[in-house]
């Protein structure tokens, strides 16, 4: 189980993203069993995003990863493959995809009242 929340900052119309294809690509890239990678894509209007200085171009994409941390030494490798797959799916440069790993999800994610045991 990683859960990946992808937030795409957009200027106008929300970008069309094939979320299913992205989930499959991320699952393959992360060597995950089918059904264990979950992806949610949301859009954030550029008017609701700012950086100090000029507005960046192209606009950024943020990916929050909720997963069991396991070996945090693998995070750079995972960040690379996540950024590459997301960049392809949303048609943005990989450098504009920011991957953020949340704290270890062990004991924090439940299905109903049962903790995730995968």
Give the predicted meaning of each segment.
Residues 1-118:
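Interaction-mediating elements
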């Amino acid at each position: 189980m990683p859960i990946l929340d992808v937030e795409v900052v957009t200027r106008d119309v929300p970008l069309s993203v094939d979320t299913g294809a992205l989930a499959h690509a991320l699952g393959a890239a992360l060597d995950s069993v089918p059904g264990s990678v979950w992806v949610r894509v949301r859009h954030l209007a550029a008017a609701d995003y700012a950086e100090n200085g000029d507005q960046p171009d192209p606009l950024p994409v943020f990916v929050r990863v909720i997963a069991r941390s396991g070996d945090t030494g693998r995070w750079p490798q995972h960040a690379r493959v996540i950024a590459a797959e997301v960049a392809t799916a949303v048609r943005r440069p990989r450098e504009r995809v920011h991957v953020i790993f949340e704290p270890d999800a062990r004991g924090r994610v439940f299905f109903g009242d049962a903790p995730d045991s995968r």
